[in-house]
């Protein structure tokens, strides 16, 4: 049985990967966490994962945690405020982890990355959280792994359900504005307005799972991890068609109209729009936004989990699917 070890296993991405892999009996799933007694870690343990504790900045601990692993999925949170408070960076953390994994003899690395905005824009803009990940990805490709696959997540559908995130964009679909509308206020994405959306809960883990089923096929191939693409306006209109509620999209004339208050996460979000507009909406830096690759990978994972997923659909989660599941009965 091949061991796949996940760093960041209790986060949105890592837990999705763990859940998907645990449904394939060909893999043993090991999850690295800072606190093995946390509720999220204990839930993964109850589902069959092996839980190990390690400090991501301690390469020797990380090497031990990855020992014996055939594959690794690594995600770090570049917008984690604790990094700044500890005078550390996401780049430092990522480098420590991948070096520990390489030293442990991991063969196949799937790394949650992002487009290198500073490089792809010729220095015209920077998205520090993505740029740091892209730098770590570049280093990983020279560390002796047999394969390295960068996977680039799209915009999580699930963030619309978080009140704090909804408030950043005007309140949609959580809190009405002073005029009684559920308003989504954001800059345009650019180009054909193909905003790459992802259901991290439903699809991301399966997409990563699909890579591990044939890692040589996906070596050095940046993966667009998306579930659907459409404009913010169409997303809001889909919500209206399902719920009948008053909702609207209001386009900002420029990303610079977004208030960030110096917060790293908000600065990154504004940077996404600046970068995407510079690239005419081709956010991933690998060509037009597409979901054929993600579809093929999810279908491969579904086949590998056949005993556990009889009767389930292998399709990606469309915007309508996502909104129907959360709001479809509110009309």
Swiss-Prot record:
GO terms for molecular function: oxidoreductase activity. InterPro entries: NAD(P)-bd_dom_sf (IPR036291), NmrA-like (IPR008030), NmrA-like_oxidored (IPR051164). It comes from the Eukaryota. Pathway: Secondary metabolite biosynthesis. Its EC number is 1.-.-.-. NADP(+) binds at residues 8-13, 34-38, 55-56, 76-78, 133, 155-167. Keywords: NADP, Oxidoreductase. It is an enzyme of class 1 (oxidoreductase). SUPFAM superfamilies: NAD(P)-binding Rossmann-fold domains. Pfam families: NmrA. Gene3D superfamilies: NAD(P)-binding Rossmann-like Domain, UDP-galactose 4-epimerase, domain 1. PANTHER family: NITROGEN METABOLITE REPRESSION PROTEIN NMRA FAMILY MEMBER (PTHR42748), NMRA-LIKE DOMAIN-CONTAINING PROTEIN (PTHR42748:SF30). Belongs to the NmrA-type oxidoreductase family. This is NmrA-like family domain-containing oxidoreductase himF. It comes from Aspergillus japonicus. The gene is himF.
């Amino acid at each position: 049985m091949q061991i796949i070890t996940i760093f960041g296993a209790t986060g949105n991405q890592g837990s999705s990967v763990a859940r998907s892999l645990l449904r394939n009996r060909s893999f043993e799933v090991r999850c690295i966490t800072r606190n093995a007694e946390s509720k999220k870690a204990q839930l993964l343990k109850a589902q069959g994962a092996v839980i190990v504790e390690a400090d991501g900045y301690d390469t020797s601990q990380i090497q031990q945690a990855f020992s014996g692993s055939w594959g690794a999925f690594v995600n770090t949170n570049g917008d984690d405020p604790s990094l700044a408070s500890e005078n550390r960076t996401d780049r430092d953390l990522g480098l420590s982890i991948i070096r520990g994994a390489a030293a442990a003899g991991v063969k196949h690395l799937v790394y949650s990355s992002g487009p290198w905005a500073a490089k792809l824009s010729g220095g015209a803009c920077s998205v520090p959280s993505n740029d740091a990940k892209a730098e770590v990805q570049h280093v990983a490709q020279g560390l002796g792994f047999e394969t390295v696959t960068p996977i680039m997540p799209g915009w999580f559908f699930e963030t619309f359900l978080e009140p704090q995130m909804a408030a950043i964009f005007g309140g949609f679909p959580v809190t009405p504005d002073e005029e009684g509308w559920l308003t989504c206020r954001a800059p345009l994405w650019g180009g054909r307005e193909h905003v790459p959306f992802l259901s991290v809960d439903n699809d991301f883990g399966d997409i990563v799972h699909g890579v591990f089923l044939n890692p040589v096929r996906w070596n050095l191939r940046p993966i667009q991890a998306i579930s659907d693409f459409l404009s913010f306006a169409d997303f809001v209109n889909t919500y209206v068609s399902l719920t009948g509620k008053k909702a609207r999209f209001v386009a900002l004339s420029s990303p610079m109209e977004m208030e960030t208050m110096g917060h790293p996460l908000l600065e990154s979000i504004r940077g996404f729009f600046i970068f995407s507009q510079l690239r005419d909406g081709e956010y991933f830096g690998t060509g037009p936004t597409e979901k054929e690759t993600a579809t093929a990978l999810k279908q491969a994972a579904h086949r590998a989990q056949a005993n556990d997923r009889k009767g389930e659909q292998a399709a990606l989660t469309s915007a309508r699917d996502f909104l129907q599941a959360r709001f479809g009965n509110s009309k």
